[in-house]
A protein has these predicted regions:
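Glycine-rich, aromatic-lined ligand/substrate-binding cores of catalytic
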Residues: 97, 306-480
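Short, solvent-exposed loop/turn elements at domain surfaces
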Residues: 101-104, 126-129, 196, 291-293, ...
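Structural recognition of the beta-strand scaffold that forms the well-ordered cores
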Residues: 91-95, 116-121, 186, 204-205, ...
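N-terminal glycine-/serine-/threonine-rich beta1-alpha1-beta2 phosphate-ribose binding loop
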Residues: 18, 23-25, 29, 33-224, ...
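A contiguous active-site-proximal alpha/beta segment in oxidoreductase catalytic domains
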Residues: 225, 233-312
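A structural signal for well-ordered alpha-helical segments within the folded catalytic domains
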Residues: 102, 213, 217, 240, ...
Length: 480
């Protein structure tokens, strides 16, 4: 991945390393109404940004001088319980309306503090998106807008700006008891949206990784608050530029997918209580990737689908011929457009670890990737590429001592690779699960789920003794 260049959209920004505050917290996803449960096989890894969302008043106040431009008259009492007057709603523009945006739109539409007023996507009305379960997206839309026959006869995966506009307006019409609702603008180019939609309070960016920074910076320049899906950017310098812009303008932002819950705190509490002695290693492994990792660049040149703007999709990236292997979930596997498995899932599992242990940049990083072989002119040889992520890899990050914390190593594994099963687990005739996290100290080990949830000392006898010593209740059985 290249870290040495700044695309034209960022040339006037001075990158700097600076902290930022997470103003939005999320715990809910999918196309669900507030009281619905997740459908079977639904991907619940990505939290919605709407379980706790700032009011318009809070957003304006965090914007500093911008708050003085508005006179807000509270009318909650006049409107009754749950009523939020239009003057206090967050007016939201959704940039990017593919499968992940569709999964999250239910929680946004259900929030009384938010009014979706515009959608934007380079795809008009696509049917070639990818999903994690057959008809999951289509059936989720049907459930959300309460139309069981929506797009009857189509097994394609829908997405795009027209789909987004239809979802938003149908949902609002039914919530108001109306036959129709017309209040959601529709754009192909985010720049046009930002120029024309003067009343937008916040922008939610849910596009391929390589366009996150360009869209976020453009919105921040307009004084708009930004929610951007992980990762913040696809280049270190781009991420620093976004952070610096948000800090300089004192604008409320959300640059991470979620904060950890109490269940994820247990491992860190045990570490702080000395349950495993001095922490030396952290191991985190993921079943990702769930998309193809192509070892070769495509050579054929299929036509660009009708209604899909390839130039806008490329954004700040260099021009190249269109190919479906670059787009619609596939983008995660390419250096130019995505960040691989660790950028897809590492934010969820590692952010709390970095935050609570005070980890900064590692002093060194080494990666051991898998490779692909081919036969060329009767010769077996490895395929060399510098454009796509491997099917599997191990990454080792070494962190220098900081304060009272000694040096430690953090290991990331993906593509089916796991660390060796610890002796404590093998003695109980158990194996490591498909995903998980393990903390290794001088005097013991803690094993948990992918985000360190349901953390337990191993072996079980050690956990029982710890639970007794700290008056902790017996845990509920884990769902598998």
């Amino acid at each position: 991945m290249r870290f040495d260049r700044l695309p034209p959209a960022f040339e006037d920004q001075a990158p700097d390393v600076c902290a930022f505050r997470d103003h939005f917290h999320g715990t809910r996803s999918l196309l669900m109404k507030p009281n619905d449960s997740a459908p079977e096989n639904a991907d619940t890894n990505s939290p919605s940004p709407c379980s706790r969302i700032l009011s318009r008043r809070e957003l304006l106040l965090t914007g500093g001088a911008a708050a003085t431009a508005f006179t807000i008259v509270p009318r909650h009492v006049l409107g009754g319980v749950g009523f939020v007057p239009p003057s206090e709603k967050i007016t939201l523009a959704c940039v990017g309306f593919g499968t992940q945006a569709i999964r999250e739109i239910g929680g946004i539409l259900a929030s009384p503090d938010v009014q979706v007023v515009a959608v934007c996507d380079v795809e008009k009305d696509g049917t070639h998106y990818l999903e994690w379960g057959k008809n999951q997206i289509r059936d989720g839309i049907r459930q959300l807008i309460d139309e069981p026959g929506w797009r009857e006869g189509s097994d394609h995966v829908p997405g795009g700006r027209d789909v987004g506009k239809e979802i938003v307006e149908t949902y609002y019409a039914k919530q108001r008891g109306q036959d129709q609702y017309k209040g959601c603008a529709c754009y192909a180019d985010f720049r046009e949206l930002l120029d024309k939609e003067k009343d937008v309070t916040a922008v939610k960016v849910m596009t391929p990784d390589h366009t996150h920074a360009a869209i976020s910076i453009a919105a921040l320049k307009k004084g708009m608050n930004v929610i951007v899906h992980k990762p913040l950017a696809n280049r270190v310098m781009e991420a620093r530029s976004v952070i610096e812009m948000a800090r300089a303008n004192k604008i409320a932002t959300h640059f991470l997918p979620a904060s950890e819950g109490a269940n994820q705190k247990q491992a860190l509490e045990m570490i702080k209580n000395g349950a495993i002695g001095t922490l030396r290693e952290i191991h985190n492994w993921s079943m990702r990737p769930m998309w193809p990792q192509f070892p070769n660049l495509p050579t054929d040149k299929p036509p660009i689908p009708a209604g899909f703007d390839w130039t806008l999709w490329l954004g700040p990236s260099l021009d190249r011929p269109y190919h479906p292997d670059y787009t619609h979930t596939h983008f995660r596997g390419w250096y130019e457009f995505g960040g691989g498995s660790i950028a897809d899932m590492g934010h969820y599992s590692l952010w709390p670890i970095f935050q609570d242990l005070g980890l900064d940049s590692p002093v060194s990083v080494e990666s051991t990737p898998s490779h692909v072989c081919t036969v060329s002119d009767t010769i077996c040889q490895r395929i060399k590429n510098d454009f796509s992520f491997p099917a599997a890899c191990t990454i080792r990050m070494r962190f220098a001592p900081r304060g009272e914390r000694p040096a430690l190593d953090l290991y990331w594994y993906d593509g089916g690779i796991k660390p060796p099963a610890p002796d404590e687990l093998m003695a109980e005739n158990k194996e490591l699960e498909e995903e998980g996290m393990m903390f290794v100290g001088d005097n013991g080990k803690i094993l948990g789920g992918f985000r360190s949830e349901d953390a337990q000392l191993i072996p079980e006898t050690k956990m029982r003794a710890y639970r007794t010593a700290h008056n902790l209740p017996e845990p509920a059985p884990r769902e598998r």
